[in-house]
Amino acid sequence: MSTPSRFKKDKEIIAEYESQVKEIRAQLVEQQKCLEQQTEMRVQLLQDLQDFFRKKAEIETEYSRNLEKLAERFMAKTRSTKDHQQYKKDQNLLSPVNCWYLLLNQVRRESKDHATLSDIYLNNVIMRFMQISEDSTRMFKKSKEIAFQLHEDLMKVLNELYTVMKTYHMYHAESISAESKLKEAEKQEEKQIGRSGDPVFHIRLEERHQRRSSVKKIEKMKEKRQAKYSENKLKSIKARNEYLLTLEATNASVFKYYIHDLSDLIDCCDLGYHASLNRALRTYLSAEYNLETSRHEGLDIIENAVDNLEPRSDKQRFMEMYPAAFCPPMKFEFQSHMGDEVCQVSAQQPVQAELMLRYQQLQSRLATLKIENEEVKKTTEATLQTIQDMVTIEDYDVSECFQHSRSTESVKSTVSETYLSKPSIAKRRANQQETEQFYFMKLREYLEGSNLITKLQAKHDLLQRTLGEGHRAEYMTTRPPNVPPKPQKHRKSRPRSQYNTKLFNGDLETFVKDSGQVIPLIVESCIRFINLYGLQHQGIFRVSGSQVEVNDIKNSFERGENPLADDQSNHDINSVAGVLKLYFRGLENPLFPKERFNDLISCIRIDNLYERALHIRKLLLTLPRSVLIVMRYLFAFLNHLSQYSDENMMDPYNLAICFGPTLMPVPEIQDQVSCQAHVNEIIKTIIIHHETIFPDAKELDGPVYEKCMAGDDYCDSPYSEHGTLEEVDQDAGTEPHTSEDECEPIEAIAKFDYVGRSARELSFKKGASLLLYHRASEDWWEGRHNGIDGLVPHQYIVVQDMDDTFSDTLSQKADSEASSGPVTEDKSSSKDMNSPTDRHPDGYLARQRKRGEPPPPVRRPGRTSDGHCPLHPPHALSNSSVDLGSPSLASHPRGLLQNRGLNNDSPERRRRPGHGSLTNISRHDSLKKIDSPPIRRSTSSGQYTGFNDHKPLDPETIAQDIEETMNTALNELRELERQSTAKHAPDVVLDTLEQVKNSPTPATSTESLSPLHNVALRSSEPQIRRSTSSSSDTMSTFKPMVAPRMGVQLKPPALRPKPAVLPKTNPTIGPAPPPQGPTDKSCTM
């Protein structure tokens, strides 16, 4: 019964094995089908991509052709125009025309780009897809062959396993059979042994012999079966071992195929497919991205051109395009009739009165017209600003129209929301047209009025020159007078700064706001010092100075002092330059903000230097005003310094290397090495094109760097530091007023509107009531308005209660001038005034050498905060060479005569010991000018004229009068010096006011040089400024100090007029100029 079940079991085993092998065989076939299907799908996908790009290339080609047609259509119209010829020549076009050409160029550029894109699709991308398809098919075939080989090997392994398994079954069955036979033999042996245990005596001999032989047979059979069993058992063990080994090998082969070989087969099919497809699609992306880059570059060019839509430059280009039409014609010359040789307006006695009357009428008429025209101008400018606000409304953002979302509701027409469809457009257009009509009406009115003013002003100026008036009285006008110069501070002992902001390692904007210094003193002073002594210094800013000296200068500035104020200071130029660099390098926020670094560096990509400068200007205009003013001042100085590169070896590039890391440090996140070259290029561009980049004084009110500086010029700016009067008030503990009555507040009424130029000056409206404390100078009061203390300009107010003689109206001075004969001669042009700080001209030094006499010593002027004492006329009597044209002699005759006749022992002198400047002049200084009495310089016309006899004065008489006047003044100076016992530190305000009252008058009496002098009912003394040249051969003159005007850049001091050619002089040697006088110690430090 056991055998059939055993065979059945063997069959089940074989059937199960065969079933498993069959499943593997079917799986191998399915794998091959899947690989084949995958390859077909790839080929189909690649075919679709080819068709897609082929169609897209056709579309791009068609689009390119249409764009080319569009551009050609409009380019054909412009090729024959003058604009196109100008564009081809130098590309200097009007900005709108430039935008138009750039639009057409952009269309042509896009046309070329799309044609290039189509070519890339056809000849590059599609070819790549075709190659990928061929490669995929070939790889599948190769992989299929390898797969068949692997399948055969796998089936051989399975067949071998089947054979080994059957062998194992067979030997195992034989072993079992032999074992059962052996067991049966053992049982028979046991039975036989059991029988042999019976008593032998009962068994017959024959039976006993028969049993013995049967036992032997059983033993032999057992031995035989034992041997058979052992043999079969060994075979079975060997067969089983072989089967197990083969089974393990088969399982390993199957596992390897499914885990490794199959993956390798798939990799063979995919070999290069994804990489090739990646390259093909990246070719497409590169083409599209480069198309967009090219488009963006073109749009950036157009955007830059749109940003440069500027009417001023277009106006200039337009006028340059038609020079013949817009060039001013030649002036009309005087055409003499029948030999008439007179070509000037005659002011002789018969017509003098008529010309005087006409001059007065023109003066009055001009004043009225200017006020009216100024109001019309303000209205015009306000209307223009309104129109500009209307036309510059930012309504061009259409980003909402391009917002994408999954919802189709957002993809709707936005035409209803555009600017042109808004309901308010009609009303806006109507308002704009109405405003434009009003603007043109006011503009026509303003132009007509300004034309009339121009004609009347020309006549007025000609009459003024003819009649010989140097300074007309301002009482004739009804418009606000020029703003007087600010009272400047004392430089003798600069007190410690009152601001709390750090100078070094601080914030520039905060420091300017806190200190009131528009240009920090350290910047202004260092630049001035280098301007005077270091422009030709080789290697300036590149060669390091003494660290000890740099620290000393730095500490002095931090204490609020100015160590460079003394012109005789022998600081090393390199140390001063090092302090300037140290200041900018230590700023908490660099001069160029870090947030603007990337924007500025991006300007390097602009090759055109002018366009680059304009782009930099656009970026810098976003900076704070205070920083921009300092930046403008610094780069104007660096540009000036680079003009001496032949001597100092510092061209703009070298200066940029020195100042680049200081002014524009590279952020830490940037590459320091690569960015530094770009930074230097930016700084170099700003140095070279600083006039283009920075707004001028008209656009940005503030100090402007002057190339020609003198020892005291750098404080001439009306933007000097505030709080100077407080420093004067604190100096020596003196009171800045001239009488005890001024201690009581005085009420005043504003005649005109005034807007303060700084926080120190008060702003007020016409008719406002002001409270005046005391007189700070001839031009300024210390007062209060609306609870705020500050400076009040004298010429803008009417004083209700004034007992002080200095504070009285200047009409008293005019009366005294009209009644004083000895001083009327001195009303000459202010251009002839001699500066006490002038150096000796070459002519004078040459004459001294010819005489064999040493020239008078040249004294460097002391420091003041402004180059002249604003509280003291610049004709200080400490200069013993009295100039007949000095305003002091013409403007203050009463004070001069009173001073001359004043008893030195009078109560007035005792009450004011040492306050007059005369007591502060040393005898040695006073005696310096006795050697060479000078001849007074001529007026601007070149000769002395008297309107009484119309004859030129004798030069010898003039020299004799000058000598007598000089000797008299010197004698009085010596007497006053001997009698003066009190010495005190000079006070700017008090000394100035005392000198105005106590100035001596010359002894000579001559006729007035100007008939207009007797006409003026009120003469305001001209505000003058002193300019001291740093070179020995440069002469400076006094010139009227006018209020700073927007757009008017400060210029170097004008040279004196040439001296008149007087009789009895060598034609090769000019007349001796007045010798150098000692410094006016009432205004110097």
Swiss-Prot record:
Residues 743-802 form the SH3 domain. GO terms for cellular component: cytoplasm; cytosol. The modification Phosphothreonine is found at T1001. GO terms for biological process: cell migration; negative regulation of cell migration; Rho protein signal transduction. Keywords: Coiled coil, Disease variant, GTPase activation, Phosphoprotein, SH3 domain. The modification Phosphoserine is found at S416, S835, S917, S932, S999, S1032. The record marks R542 as: Arginine finger. Residues 506-694 form the Rho-GAP domain. Residues 808-822, 937-946, 997-1011 have a biased composition (Polar residues). Expressed in brain, lung, kidney, and testis. It holds the Pfam family FCH. Residues 351-390, 956-985 form a coiled coil. Residues 19-314 form the F-BAR domain. Residues 1027-1037 have a biased composition (Low complexity). Residues 475-496, 808-954, 997-1038, 1051-1085 are annotated as: Disordered. GO terms for molecular function: GTPase activator activity; small GTPase binding. Homodimer. Forms a heterooligomer with SRGAP2 and SRGAP3 through its F-BAR domain. Interacts with ROBO1, CDC42 and RHOA. Interacts with FASLG. GTPase-activating protein for RhoA and Cdc42 small GTPases. Together with CDC42 seems to be involved in the pathway mediating the repulsive signaling of Robo and Slit proteins in neuronal migration. SLIT2, probably through interaction with ROBO1, increases the interaction of SRGAP1 with ROBO1 and inactivates CDC42. This is SLIT-ROBO Rho GTPase-activating protein 1. The lineage of its organism: Eukaryota, Metazoa, Chordata, Craniata, Vertebrata. The gene is SRGAP1.
